[in-house]
Amino acid sequence: MRIMGLDYGDRRIGVAISDKLGMTAQGQEVIIRKTPEEDLEVIKGLIDKYEVEEIIVGMPKNMDGSLGPRAEKTRDFIDFLQKSLDTPVKVWDERLSTVEAERVLIEADVSRKKRKGVIDKVAASIILQGYLNYQNKLHG
């Protein structure tokens, strides 16, 4: 079963896809946001292309667990996906995923210019990998 991980942002949506066994997450692409409807069509295309059976969307909580303005936008996006898709959509805590993605890219010596283009899909893969690790531990 393939699972899609999404890192939702104001300008871009990072996309990661799991392997068929649900063990590893791989950053796939970055969707440059347009309208919600156009973004949805791109996501639907990826669901079909990768035969995705579940979607995980990272929820940007504050360090104290509270939800800020960015989380409210993400919640609206999740609600939109849940109403528009047959594929189940779940929420996953994404605290510090972008910070972790930035650290990984810096350690890999990726230039600042290139980091900007890939950070969202790396963050999506970190979100998805966290979910996969949790699921695998749960059902180990």
From Swiss-Prot:
SUPFAM superfamilies, sorted: Ribonuclease H-like
InterPro entries: RNaseH-like_sf (IPR012337), YqgF (IPR005227), YqgF/RNaseH-like_dom (IPR006641), YqgF/RNaseH-like_dom_sf (IPR037027)
CDD domains to which the protein is assigned, alphabetical: YqgF (cd16964)
Keyword Isomerase carried by entry: no
UniProt xrefs under PANTHER family: POLYNUCLEOTIDYL TRANSFERASE, RIBONUCLEASE H-LIKE SUPERFAMILY PROTEIN (PTHR33317:SF4)
Protein family: Belongs to the YqgF nuclease family.
Name of the protein this chain belongs to: Putative pre-16S rRNA nuclease
Organism annotation: Halothermothrix orenii (strain H 168 / OCM 544 / DSM 9562)
Lineage: Bacteria, Bacillati, Bacillota, Clostridia, Halanaerobiales
